[in-house]
Amino acid sequence: SVAALMTPQLIARRLKDSGDADKVIVPGLCLGDIAPLADQYGVPVERGPADLKDLPQYFGQVGLAPDLSDYRVKIFAEIVDAPMLSVAGIVAKAQAYKAQGANVIDLGCLPGVPFAHLKDAVQALKALGFAVSVDSLSVDDLLTAGHAGADYLLSLTEKTLWVAHEVAATPVLIPAKPHSLPSLYRAIEACQKAGKPFIADAILDPIHFGLTQSIVRYQALRKKYPDIAIMMGIGNLTELTDADTTGINTLLFGIISELNINAVLATSVSPHAVNAIAEADLARRVMHAAKADDRLPRGYSNGLLGLHDRRPFTYSVDEIKEIAS
């Protein structure tokens, strides 16, 4: 880091000549005009890469490929229209989400829409080896799902927590009232007292409807309970913002990494969010690797760069004319 702070003037003062070297390479973060250095030393002077780990590529070597095989965040991929699909249709969508990186398939129930084949859907997915969660406002649906073998139930409050004691499924806890952390804390402490495993979700709100405050709530939740499992539903940002989901997922997973959040509930409904689950999979791996290396999340993958390349190759005017012709 000290070398990166050197200026051309400092280098000129400290390094009187280049000795036997036929080229001088200064740090990539060295700012200023380096042409006078070439005049002083009589050899070419170049600016190297900004990041130490880019040196192999700078010298023409392939370098070590980042290891993105590990991650810590589970992805729950929600099938939001599950009641409207056949069991075969649910299985097909589950297989597609699994291929994109989903760890758990979430069956989203619709208010007022019967889900007569809920039990069959859960059992079909379990028979194929899927981990399954069911998301419903109806305690009847949640009980049916739990008895059918669902692994997780979304979402229970302190008022409906009794459901969790009727089945083996792990409950995902949310506030009984919007934004009410005390009610979430009470549900958490009830599960802890009963020895019941759980996941807590403080609820991420959309932009202009409480986003910033909801992030603060997640921070407060993690500070109060350093060791519990926490989930964040990211669809309120990826689905409800007209912006490329690559950047949204990247930023969210940076926050998720800093807060040690253990799971996300992701959706892929809007046309612009068609790859949101696959992007979430890559983002969790990049952030995990960068955190393990104690580095900024740069140089691990280009897969989250949708509009610009990290090292763009620009064509000259003549080359563009030649291509156009």
Please state what every model-predicted region is.
Residues 1-32, 45, 132:
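Metallocofactor- and cofactor-centric catalytic cores in central/energy metabolism, strongly enriched
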Residues 6, 29-37, 56-57, 111-123, ...:
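Active-site-adjacent beta->alpha loops and helix N-cap segments on the catalytic face
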Residues 22, 43, 71-75, 102-103, ...:
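Short, well-ordered coil/turn segments that N-cap beta-strands
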Residues 42, 73-75, 112-144, 166-172, ...:
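Alpha-helix-loop-beta-strand connector modules within alpha/beta enzyme cores
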Residues 45-50, 105-111, 129-138, 149-163, ...:
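Catalytic beta/alpha-barrel core
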Residues 71-92, 176-180, 237-246:
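Active-site mouth loops of central-metabolism enzymes
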Residues 85-97, 138, 142, 184, ...:
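Short, acidic/polar
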Residues 166-308:
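Catalytic alpha/beta core domains of metabolic enzymes, predominantly
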